[in-house]
């Protein structure tokens, strides 16, 4: 299951203040704390989810990285790696809320259970494509930055010839109990950050993290009819899990470049059809562009600006559509510019002949004049 947006998890806006974040987290943590819901797996998951969200958004640097890159921008090891890491995410929880839970909840549910397992973070990749590519679909390669297990230590974080040792603080459980009077609360071990292991001699290649940053190349199939903002999920191609946890997923988010001619609206396409005023007056045959080539369109006599011609099935067949949409051509009658004296004289003669014919040549103008007179009367 993909990770939810951290702001959504806490139920706050993206511009929420630190105080708003803290209040939202307090409320969720108190509601879903395992000691209050001892037999609810769902409450336990929601508690962990809220804790993870606050630990990222409550940290200025991590929040900035998350706002820019999503889950991929947050160091996946921050959720708890070996002793080679500089600081985990559990400490903030203990500092800010240990006193609250110590006062509210009784003895914890369990004393151990082994190292904590974390699902890998999801990755987001923005892919810009053309409208033509979106309509037809295609296969492409993308290079995605990701954390991979270190080739030197094979993910252990320990120097060659050594191995991680059982954490002395938690005895390998990954958690410790804090006693406050008659109450106790279980927290992530501050020494091993939930792994249950300590690395006393870290791997020089990865500094004890157990992972290195590198690019991986993936094949992605873009389906025909995909629309702007849609996401393609590639299961298991996100960040690797921690302590044997499952990997996250990769989400390829589609961004369609602005087209020179067409604007997309669902499965339909729209375009402006600029025609000379002579063609608008006399009518004629025109060729209009479509994504599949050219199409003929008949312009009737007396066509006005704003008239729309509909070309059926000349739009896009959506990802889930059975039939393609339509193409709507919106007429714009072009007024000639930079006329010669001779052309101006011809137009004045033409104007005089129109005036001799009365309102029958300009029905819209007559209607507009009547509305103006009524407005001022």
Curated annotation (Swiss-Prot):
Positions bound to Zn(2+) 2: 167, 170, 189, 192
Job description of the protein: Participates actively in the response to hyperosmotic and heat shock by preventing the aggregation of stress-denatured proteins and by disaggregating proteins, also in an autonomous, DnaK-independent fashion. Unfolded proteins bind initially to DnaJ; upon interaction with the DnaJ-bound protein, DnaK hydrolyzes its bound ATP, resulting in the formation of a stable complex. GrpE releases ADP from DnaK; ATP binding to DnaK triggers the release of the substrate protein, thus completing the reaction cycle.
Cofactor note: Binds 2 Zn(2+) ions per monomer.
Keywords from the named record: Chaperone, Cytoplasm, DNA replication, Metal-binding, Repeat, Stress response, Zinc, Zinc-finger
Names of required cofactors: Zn(2+)
Gene this protein is translated from: dnaJ
Quaternary structure and partners: Homodimer.
Name of this chain's protein: Chaperone protein DnaJ
UniProt KW Chaperone keyword: yes
Family affiliation: Belongs to the DnaJ family.
UniProt subcellular location: Cytoplasm
SUPFAM superfamilies: Chaperone J-domain, DnaJ/Hsp40 cysteine-rich domain, HSP40/DnaJ peptide-binding domain
Domain of life: Bacteria
GO biological process terms, semicolon-separated: chaperone cofactor-dependent protein refolding; DNA replication; protein refolding; response to heat
Native source species: Bordetella parapertussis (strain 12822 / ATCC BAA-587 / NCTC 13253)
Domain remarks in the Swiss-Prot or TrEMBL record: The J domain is necessary and sufficient to stimulate DnaK ATPase activity. Zinc center 1 plays an important role in the autonomous, DnaK-independent chaperone activity of DnaJ. Zinc center 2 is essential for interaction with DnaK and for DnaJ activity.
Pfam families xrefs: DnaJ (PF00226), DnaJ_C (PF01556), DnaJ_CXXCXGXG (PF00684)
MF GO annotations: ATP binding; heat shock protein binding; unfolded protein binding; zinc ion binding
Chief localization: cytoplasm
